[in-house]
Amino acid sequence: MSQYSDDDYSHEDDSEMEDEDEEDEYEPRSSRKGRSGKKRGRSNSDSDGRRGSKKKSSGSAFIDWEVEVDDDVEDDDDDVDVEDGKQQLKFGDFSLCFIVSGEADLPNEDSDHRRQYYQRGFHPHEEDVDELEKRTLERLSTKYAKDDYELDDVNDVDQQALLPSVRDPKLWLVKCAIGREREVAVCLMQKIVDRGSEFKIRSAIALDHLQNYVYIEADMEAHVKEAIKGMRNIYANQKILLVPIKEMTAVLSVESKAIDLSRDSWVRMKLGIYKGDLAQVVDVDNVRKRVTVKLIPRIDLQALANKLEGTENVKKKAFAPPPRFMNIDEARELHIRVEHRRDPMTGDYFENIGGMLFKDGFLYKKVSTKSIAAQNVTPTFDELERFKRPNENGEIDFVDESTLFANRKKGHFMKGDAVIVIKGDLKNLKGWIEKVDEENVLIRSEMKDLPNPIAVNGRELCKYFEPGNFVKVVSGIHEGGTGMIVKVDQHMLIILSDTTKEHICVFADHVAKSAEVTKGVTKIGDYELHDLVILSDFSFGVILKLDSEAIQILKGVPDSSEVSIVKASEIKYKIWKKINVQDRYKNVVAVKDVVRVIEGPSKGKQGPVVQIYKGVLFIHDRHNLEHTGFICTRCSSCVLAGGNFKTPALVPPSPRRFQRADMGYNPGAGGRHQGGRGRRGDDHLVGTYVKIRLGPFKGYSGRLVEVKDKLVRVELEAKIVTVERKAISDMTDNVVATPQYNMGSQTPMHPSRTPLHPCMTPMRHSGATPIHDGMRTPMRGRAWNPYMPMSPPRDNWEDGNPGSWGTSPYEAATPGSDWGSSTPGRSSYRDAGTPINNANAPSPMTPSSTSYLPTTPGGQAMTPGTDLDVMSLDIGGDAETRFIPGILVNVHKAGEDRNPGVIRDVLPDGSCVVALGHRGEGETIRATQNKVSLVCPKKNERVKILGGKYCGSTAKVIGEDGQDGIVKLDESLDIKILKLTILAKLVHE
């Protein structure tokens, strides 16, 4: 009637024998505890009884088993196994394991409570084991909850104690054969297994990412040498290196999670000439760890053609070719072999050039997954513009919009954000976010038929905005800017910036709704918005916009809106100096003064002056939306608001180039080019721009700030240097100090005379009535009419000219001279002028505003805006200027601004037929040459050379250096430096 079979009894007997052996094993331990052997003996006798009677009732078997459990539970030391922080409670044939701290012991239950618990009887069918485990865990956790909390804090500190110290074994770096790292580690392990404790090394480590080396853990270097002795894959003659203690923890680092690459995801290249370039994943081979990417090629077709022909230059190039789409037709023109092949793996057709595959201008390249960076790759809008392709409807669309938002930061979406689904079955579904989980986002949709809320993966969502919303850019190159959305194009937004008043294009995922208006980025490093800076190419400009990656600068090119985007490293320094200039009517203009532009492309605009440099004004016109309202123009093209509009004298004295002197003789000051020493620091060159001709600073130009004996101090654009005086040349005057015409042989140039300027009353033209033959009829000859063209022009320096009105100023005047009686010597008409600065014949008309009247000081100053005489040596350098058809000039009319025009013809009398307008589209007028002046050419403009050795040649301006222009001749392609005054701007019809 027993419910157990014989097999069950035999199995039970085997279990009892194992229990008996276990009790014998722990008997010494029980004696140490002072346990009584009476109860143990009773248990043994019971076991013998069971073995003696094999047939027992099911009830007796159950009772004996229960008693055994009672004894085992009571004997805490024998039945509680403590190993590695685990405590195991044994209940018959099953056990419960609890992970507890090593410092805490299991609680000693009250004996009465324990006895009462087991007297209820236990049977596997009467109570569920899971329920028993649950109640036991609750009892233990409740009693020691506080202790566990306190031990958690201790464990954090204990983790620091696990770091290696000087008492721990050392880590040694041993060099081995490449590719044999794992084999060396296995061989060392086999040695330890075979020979036991003979070797005293602890471990051997072979890392996958470290080739040619293995790590061996040992206490001493001698132990390592003994272990590696006789191994063929280890270089025994190489030095064994000790790993520093601080670097030991970094040796065994956890390998990062494998990157999950998918098609159409964006990556950046890490190696080669494509380093940093954006690429798109086309295919992924997870087995070989290789991917096929699509990127914009950087290929020099000419170098590729030379390589294929075998004429490649051995010299290595110092730069990588710029990214450019492949042009197959251009490659064929260079005789590069192009093959049209089909890829057997994908079935697509590619153009094969030298083993490289091209399609639609892109390069398809197979690379290793280790050579690309796929994490935190956020393409810029400009980069994605180049990867766009037309869709089935012919519209331009991105490949996969969801790939653009795969690298979002955590917490990107917030509750209440309007979103739209961009991928999956719910594509184009709009809604609002209610809750954000780890990866899924709960949204409430607009459609009533759908259940709310709906769980959608965060990668399938994008923020949604409507025109008119005020937003703030939270990421990207425009980060920090605010503005209003004016247009929504799919998931791209066009925003009107609050600061620049310009349209910027950003992704909808990069903005957030905001009512605040910020100024954006106004300072990066040492540079702030609207600073005047000098660039690396020595050009200057004003900062219009500051971004995290680039700086937008309006260059100082008058009447041209030349804007360049540079990096902060391309800026040399910032200009702090504030300069005052003069406007068209000689009114002083300073920073913050309001001026109005009266000529040029910006004519009619006005605003305050923000920066001034080299006669160029940077004006901010708040009504101008282009370039944040900034315009660039010359100071001579502006007038000061509220200033004097009276036309100044045509030849005013230049306060910078000449010293103000008395009419009488000043013995303390040396004249210009006369060799006089003068006072210390008092020289006519002070304040002028000079160029250094000799020495280590040869070729540098700057402003002369001080003269001291034979040395001068020149303020370069970068610093002030000291050079010898003979090593500089004046850049503000085109003529040289060599006396011209009949003055070359006079030594000294100005002979001694006492007094040099005699007293005369009246001072000029004493006794001349009428003055200068004013009543003569006709008044004067045609040769001396300043308004009558002369071919060739003549002046009073030609001694052989019978029509000359005067003699040499250094000869005694003969009777009948028109100049009146004066002591032989230099006329007192001017003071301290150079021999080349004697004026032409004075006009008898009074008053007169022509440049033929004597001036103080003498000579025609090169003041901007002053009409130059056709005979002036300043025009054309060493040769006279002859106007030719097809060049752009300025026509000066009385009471009007300078009007641009194009010379259509030059008449025999020297006058010009000019068509007004920048391209000659206006009316045609006739003007004399003294009413016409050249337009100064700018960089990259084509010019005609009007004087000098290359007169009549055409060239292209490639740069400016003060008063000189750097041109490239069209015929010989030579680079020449010529005066800007002989360069005429050509007009392209």
From Swiss-Prot:
Q: Where is the composition biased (Low complexity)?
A: 842-852
Q: Which residues form the signal peptide?
A: none
Per the UniProt record, which residue ranges are transmembrane? none
**One GO term of the cellular component aspect?**
nucleus
Alphabetized InterPro entries for the sequence = KOW, KOW_Spt5_1, KOW_Spt5_2, KOW_Spt5_3, KOW_Spt5_4, KOW_Spt5_6, NGN-domain, NGN-like_dom
Molecular function terms, GO-annotated: structural constituent of ribosome
Residues of the KOW domain:
260-287, 412-439, 464-491, 588-615, 683-710, 936-963
Q: Does the keyword ATP-binding apply?
A: no
Family under the similarity heading: Belongs to the SPT5 family.
**UniProt-recorded name of the protein:** Putative transcription elongation factor SPT5 homolog 2
